[in-house]
Amino acid sequence: IRRTPGGRGTDGWVFKDLKVGDQVKIAGPYGRFFFRTARENAAIMIGGGTGLAPLKSMVRHVLETGTGQTMYLYHGVRGAADLYDVEFFRGLAAEHPDQFFYRPCLSEEDGVEGTSHGLVTDVVMGDFPTLRGMVAYLCGPPPMVEASLKMLMRKRLFPRDTYREDFFDSSDKATGGVRSPLIRTS
C-alpha cells in the first residue's frame, strides 16, 4: 500500500492504526468496471501502477472461463521496483501464447530486461498501426487514463468501445479530479 499524505485511508487508518498481521474485512467490488465477455473483440488493457489489479482479475476470468477473447495487457510504471506480478503474467503469456500478451513499460528506467522503455501510451502507439475493432480497458491514475483516451482516439478506438476506472486520491479530489467529456465512466 502506497501512503498518500493526508489520505483518509492511508494516513488516517492504514499507517496510523494497522499493524502487520491485523485482519481487515473488505467488501466489493461494487462498480461497473468489468470485462464484457459478450463482446468478442480483442481487448487492449492499460494499467498504471496499482491499476493493474482489476485488469488482472479480468485476465484471469477470461482465461479461466474460456470465452476466447485475445487480450493485450500493458502495465505502465516509473521503474522496475514498481512492477508486480511480472512472473504471474509472463507465465500466463507462455501458457496462452495466442490469446494473452503482456508488456511491462517503464517510463523512468531503461535497459531492464523484458520491459519496454517509455510512457505506456507511447509503447502502445508503437505496437499497433490501428486499434479499430478492439475494446479498451483503462485503469490507473487520472493523467494516465486521460493520456490513454487521447492515444486510443488517435488509433481509431472510440469512446463507445472504451471502459475506464480512474484512481483518485485526496489531491485529485481537492482539484476536482480529471474528467473527460469523451467517455463514460464505469
Residue map of PLM features:
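Ferredoxin-reductase
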Residues: 1-23, 41, 77-79, 105-108
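Reductase modules of NAD(P)H-dependent flavoproteins
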Residues: 70-186
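Short, compositionally biased
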Residues: 36-49
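Phosphate- and divalent-cation-binding pockets in alpha/beta enzyme and binding domains
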Residues: 34, 54-57, 147-148
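Short, Lys/Arg- and Gly-enriched loop/turn segments at beta-strand edges
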Residues: 9, 31-38, 175
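Histidine-anchored nucleotide/phosphate-binding helix
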Residues: 56-64
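Short, flexible hinge/linker loops that cap or flank conserved catalytic cores
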Residues: 36-39, 65, 130
